[in-house]
Structures are given as structure tokens and as C-alpha cells.
UniProtKB/Swiss-Prot annotation:
GO terms for biological process: pantothenate biosynthetic process. The reaction proceeds by a bi uni uni bi ping pong mechanism. Its EC number is 6.3.2.1. PANTHER family: CYTIDYLATE KINASE/PANTOATE-BETA-ALANINE LIGASE, PANTOATE--BETA-ALANINE LIGASE. Transmembrane segments: none annotated. (R)-pantoate binds at residues 61, 153. This is Pantothenate synthetase 1.
């Protein structure tokens, strides 16, 4: 496994891979890897010859009062996990390598970036789209892998690749959860034991709505109200919305296949997001 910090070196290493006509898979991360990231790596290794993992805490996707300075970082741990998982290349650039002096060109996403997280984190998806576009240009993968937990991010990136004619397949991998249902996230480490227990209200609310949907309930207000009852244990519910997975607009009620129930909530000072897809196979 190679650890590369410079774009020029990365391009040289991957030129040899392309010349050998090998398929390149890419997993962009901000580090502090967990089993969710390892599932993305596993998916890449299953379908690609070479897997590149980027580790870069992207400053442009954090707001002024967010957790950039305290976002968890442990490169030695990440390197060991990548080595055990069979990663071919770790790309771990500095902020100066990604955003050199006089940098001023950004990717401005459209309507998909406005609802849900976009309504509460202005500029977030601008930063996400910009860094992912830059990483795509640096790595030039055949396939890139993202987790379903970040459903809106996946939608924004998929739209960007289409709009900018990037020849990259975007694969979404199902959310990986702790045994008790909590969606895996690097930010879970912020939670004290009492907050960790209350954070289960998020997945339990989503699962309760999904169970009711599977039992035949199609009224959006009823499903949202059921999830909201569980979410009374969080400190602040930022949003709980049923949306169309293609447009991220509020889904029509009664629900039509499919819809996504999305939530963002604070437990203590930690902001957590999660979602569940509500769908069925037409008979």
C-alpha cells in the first residue's frame, strides 16, 4: 500500500494503473475510519482492481461555528485499517495541496443542495461538491463509492457527475449500523454514554416508520408523527422530512414508491443525520 500526499505523485502512480487497463475504485473520506468506510472499501475491492482512499478533512464544507477544529483525526489508525482492508493507495493531501494560494474556483450545486441539510448548513454542499470534483479530477476513478447515510450528499454528487460530464460511476452503499441500530459516523465519538443512549431515538424513529410503512401505512403525516414520537429524546430536532429520492422535494401523500425519510438532530452538541428508504415491490 502506498501513502501519497502530492497530486503529481498520485497521477504518476495511477498512470501506470491505467496503462495496465486496470479498473480504479475511489473512496473519498475525511478519515477517522469506521466499519461504514470499510464497507465502501470492500465494495470497491470487489469490483475494481485498485482501490484509492482519500483522507482529507475538507475545510470548505464546515461552517464558521461547526466542528472543523475538533473533527476526529488519527492517521496512524486509518493507515492500519486501510492496510488491513487491502487498500492500494491512500491519498492524504494537505489543505495547501487541495486549496493552494489564490484558489477561488468553486462548484456551485443546484436545487438538490437547498433542502434538508442545505437549509441549515449554508455553503456546505458547495464545499462538498468542490472538493469531490477536485478529487475526481486528481484520481480519475472508474467508480466512486459513497454511503447511503449521506443521502443528500450522494444525490448532489451524482447530479454533479452528470452535469459536468464526469465519466465516473457513482455507487451508493447501504448504511452500516452499530448492533443497536445507530448509524455509524465518525462524530459518534463525541457522544457521552448518556447521549449515546438517547441517540438511538433517531434510528428507532426511522425504523418504526419503516415498519408501519411495510404494514401498509401510506399517509406521510402519520409516518412522520410516528417517527417524531421517538425523536422526543433528542435535544433538538433540526428536520424530519419525507422526500422524493430523485428530487429531494417533499413526497406526495399518500406515498408513492419510493420515498426517503430523512432526519437531522442534535444530541447534546453533536449533530447526527440518518435516513431510511421506504419502498416496496409493486405486485
Amino acid at each position: 500500500m502506498k501513502v501519497i500526499t502530492k497530486v503529481a505523485e498520485l497521477r504518476r502512480a495511477l498512470a501506470d494503473v491505467r496503462n495496465a487497463e486496470k479498473r480504479i475504485g475511489f473512496v473519498p473520506t475525511m478519515g477517522y475510519l469506521h466499519d461504514g468506510h470499510l464497507a465502501l472499501i470492500s465494495a470497491s475491492r470487489e469490483h475494481c482492481d485498485v482501490t484509492v482512499v482519500s483522507i482529507f478533512v475538507n475545510p470548505t464544507q464546515f461552517g464558521p461555528n461547526e466542528d472543523l477544529s475538533r473533527y476526529p483525526r488519527d492517521f496512524a489508525r486509518d493507515e492500519a485499517l486501510c492496510g488491513s482492508a487491502g487498500v492500494s493507495i491512500i491519498f492524504a493531501p494537505s489543505a495547501e495541496e487541495i486549496y493552494p494560494a489564490q484558489f477561488e474556483s468553486f462548484v456551485e450545486p443546484g436545487e438538490l443542495a437547498k433542502p434538508l441539510c442545505g437549509a441549515f448548513r449554508p455553503g456546505h454542499f458547495r464545499g462538498v461538491a468542490t472538493v469531490v470534483c477536485k478529487l475526481f479530477n486528481m484520481v480519475q476513478p472508474d467508480v466512486a463509492y459513497f454511503g447511503q447515510k449521506d443521502f443528500q450528499q450522494c444525490a448532489v454528487i451524482r447530479r454533479m457527475t452528470v452535469d459536468l460530464n464526469l465519466p465516473i460511476e457513482i455507487v451508493t452503499v447501504p448504511t452500516v449500523r452499530e448492533p443497536d441500530g445507530l448509524a455509524m459516523s465518525s462524530r459518534n465519538r463525541y457522544l457521552c454514554p448518556e447521549e449515546r443512549d438517547r441517540s438511538l431515538a433517531i434510528s428507532r424513529g426511522l425504523f418504526a416508520a419503516a415498519h408501519e410503512f411495510a404494514s401498509g401505512e401510506r399517509d406521510a403525516a402519520t409516518l412522520i408523527a410516528l417517527a417524531r414520537r421517538h425523536l422526543e429524546r433528542v435535544d433538538r430536532l433540526q428536520y424530519l422530512e419525507l422526500v422524493d429520492p430523485g428530487t429531494l422535494r417533499i413526497a406526495d401523500s399518500p406515498l408513492r414508491y419510493p420515498a426517503v425519510l430523512c432526519v437531522a438532530a442534535y444530541v447534546g452538541s453533536t449533530r447526527l443525520i440518518d435516513n431510511v428508504v421506504l419502498s416496496w415491490s409493486p405486485s
